[in-house]
Curated annotation (Swiss-Prot):
Entry keyword set: Chloroplast, Endoplasmic reticulum, Fatty acid biosynthesis, Fatty acid metabolism, Iron, Lipid biosynthesis, Lipid metabolism, Membrane, Metal-binding, Oxidoreductase, Plastid, Stress response, Transmembrane, Transmembrane helix
Motif interval(s): Histidine box-3: 252-256
Organism from which the protein derives: Arabidopsis thaliana
Induction, as annotated: Down-regulated by cold.
One BP term from GO: very long-chain fatty acid biosynthetic process
Entry protein name: Delta-9 acyl-lipid desaturase 1
Amino acid sequence: MSLSASEKEENNKKMAADKAEMGRKKRAMWERKWKRLDIVKAFASLFVHFLCLLAPFNFTWPALRVALIVYTVGGLGITVSYHRNLAHRSFKVPKWLEYFFAYCGLLAIQGDPIDWVSTHRYHHQFTDSDRDPHSPNEGFWFSHLLWLFDTGYLVEKCGRRTNVEDLKRQWYYKFLQRTVLYHILTFGFLLYYFGGLSFLTWGMGIGVAMEHHVTCLINSLCHVWGSRTWKTNDTSRNVWWLSVFSFGESWHNNHHAFESSARQGLEWWQIDISWYIVRFLEIIGLATDVKLPSESQRRRMAMVR
């Protein structure tokens, strides 16, 4: 008796998970050599979370507004620029606007565009396998955050960053890669200069930490819990309640089904703030070559009900 398409998909996922579990032993944080970049990343993360602990003692209403601005500007920089524009080339904008959006993403303190885009492209190339940079098969906390602090493991899995030659050819992205730390330090200094500890703890603390964890939830939670609408060979899920906070990124099953789509909230009721921005830019003539899934693609990927 032949298996249905859905049964075959479930079997393939189980086999892939079993293979990953057998083929790669989870490595504890203390069981490997820490590279200098790992230490810098870990220190930065600890510092941001330390600022969060100080934030309640430095609360002001202007500081809360700064936190919301940092969260929004940095978050949209990640979703609109790093993710949809640079990683997937789902739309085009003039270079001055592309570079501006990318700089907004830099302020989210999630790395420079070359580093972020390369990791994300490897995630789609090796989704849920033992070569996935933040594979959910290695545990929730690994896929959520711990993978960030093991760059040697990332190289072991994926090799060198050879999948971002389009960005490496541009002086601007190479400049940001070389100087990312100086931009972050300047950002922190400006927050302190204009608002003291209140702006620093709420802007670089609360604002940045919230955006970090929302982004991390896309890698962890959205491969564990939620609904599936499309036949993808992975564990991607749609998590509706995270859509507002993630600016539309949590329609993750939609995204894995149609990676190059500029729109991830494919239904009218699926909130996707990043798409609203891209659509507005398209209406006023600044965004071109905006990619969306065709009806034939949607029919081919739809779950059998």
